[in-house]
Amino acid sequence: MTFVRILGVPNHIRVDGTGPVCVLSAGLGMAWFDWDPVVPLLAPHRTVVRFDRPGLGLSGHARAWPTLTGEAERIARVLDAAGAGAGVPATLVGHSLAGFHCEAFARLFPERTAGLVLVDSSVEEAPRPRRAPEFADACTRACGTLLSTAGVPRALGPFLRRTAVRAGRHTGGDPAPYDLVRRAYSTSRFLHAVLAENGRYRDQAVELASLRGRVPLDTLPVTVLAAYEGGSRHWLDRQRVLAERLGGVLRVSAPAGHLVMLDRPQDVVDAILGT
């Protein structure tokens, strides 16, 4: 376990395994331990770097609103702290919202990127800026303060986490140890962080759309791993379009819910090793 200060905030980092460097970045409101099923399968082949964004997992309280560029730069600082500096290209693996962050890193730091794997990544084809963003941010901050003062994180945080994980899986519950869940999800810092990430989601989608228009990916190897539980193929179609837009390859993990790393960790490993 390592902590590195990034813009004054202690960021929690974990490094396992040996070989070429691979960064695993979790989705909205998730923690480093959500990659636990993947790590033992991947670590014999890769140096696996995991981290928690501010307010999440074991990282310190966020001091600023999240931005796309800021998260890409955070990944760069995490790699520096893990011993993978500018001369050591890494494969970036982003789940859900973190797909935005990892794609942004690949565009802003091409010399540091060996490949890009998007695991059931968020997709916004035509994002629009928020209306009255200052007012929306103020409401988000006030909501977090009110709920924290009322003791909601401690009373309901772990329960809501467990519920969300069950909903995000094809089958099964939350495999994370309860003591880790309680430690990460019973705090006001977590509540403020997840509300901020959700509130700034559209802003980051708009930032990425702008970045795509200005900075190409060139010939970077890209894999889009999409979850499929059966039924409608609308989500698969959106993931396929994303893969085509990035010049990448689409792989399908089935049956799997949105939390592919929990339902089918071997599929995630195969996508990484094949990129």
Regions found by a protein language model. Give the residues of each.
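N-terminal cap/lid segment of alpha/beta-hydrolase-fold proteins
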Residues: M1-P10
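Conserved HGGG/HGGXW glycine-rich cap/lid loop of the alpha/beta-hydrolase fold
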Residues: V9-L58, L108
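The conserved beta1-alpha1 loop
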Residues: V23-G27, H95, D120
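Active-site loop/oxyanion-hole signature of alpha/beta-hydrolase fold enzymes
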Residues: R50-L97, H101, R107-F109, A126
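Core-facing hydrophobic residues within beta-strands of well-ordered domains
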Residues: G87, R112-T113, A256
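Flexible "cap/lid" loop of the alpha/beta hydrolase fold
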Residues: R107, V117-P153
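Conserved serine/cysteine hydrolase catalytic core
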Residues: L156, P177-A254
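Catalytic active-site module of serine/aspartate enzymes centered on a nucleophile-bearing elbow/loop
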Residues: E244-T275
